[in-house]
């Protein structure tokens, strides 16, 4: 049986390191997905040239090997352009084309993430976080968890509480992605609480 092991990272570099570590441990690029609003050069995906609204995969976004070599920019209604690779990227291209309701939230729930966590992960990406998910057999789930935890992911329960304390009730797919300035302020408010 397979399951999704999913973690949110405040920093793109943490997620990139986690993906590299997963691949070095023998997880295949076909099992791993990365979704972010950031590109390798530290700019937001919506600052990348060649992105448009709708069902597009735009400019090459990252460097690296394996999964990271396949990063592309995908324009998703609601959040805006995302840097994505892996099975979730394929699903998101379908989302942008209107074949799946719910955008990132729907893609995550379709890949086995429970709805409560999918709301938090989608909101985290909207606010500038980077999501890494691994679709693995139960026998390798603990190994994937250990590798992702080594990169200091967000404590989603603490983050959910922080968001709720500020009035958040759930992910709104119609809300725009945060600007670079809003992301900076978010990091100041929430710090890197784990």
Regions found by a protein language model. Give the residues of each.
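Intrinsically disordered, low-complexity, hydrophilic segments
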Residues: 1-194
């Amino acid at each position: 049986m397979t399951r999704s092991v999913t973690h949110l990272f405040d920093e793109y570099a943490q997620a990139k390191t986690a993906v590299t570590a997963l691949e070095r441990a023998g997880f295949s690029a076909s099992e791993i997905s990365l979704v972010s609003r950031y590109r390798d050069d530290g700019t937001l995906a919506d600052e990348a040239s060649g992105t448009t609204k709708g069902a597009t995969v735009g400019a090459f976004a990252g460097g690296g090997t394996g999964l990271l070599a396949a990063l592309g920019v995908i324009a998703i209604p609601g959040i805006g352009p995302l840097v994505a690779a892996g099975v979730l990227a394929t699903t998101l291209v379908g989302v942008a084309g209107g074949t799946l309701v719910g955008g990132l939230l729907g893609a995550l729930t379709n890949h086995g993430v429970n709805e409560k966590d999918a709301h938090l992960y989608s909101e985290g990406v909207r606010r500038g976080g980077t999501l890494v998910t691994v679709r693995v057999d139960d026998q390798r789930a603990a190994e994937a968890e250990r590798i992702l935890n080594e990169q200091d992911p967000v404590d989603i329960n603490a983050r959910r509480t922080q968001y709720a304390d500020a009035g958040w009730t759930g992910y709104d797919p119609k809300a725009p992605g945060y600007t670079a300035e809003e992301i900076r302020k978010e990091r100041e408010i929430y710090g890197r609480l784990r």
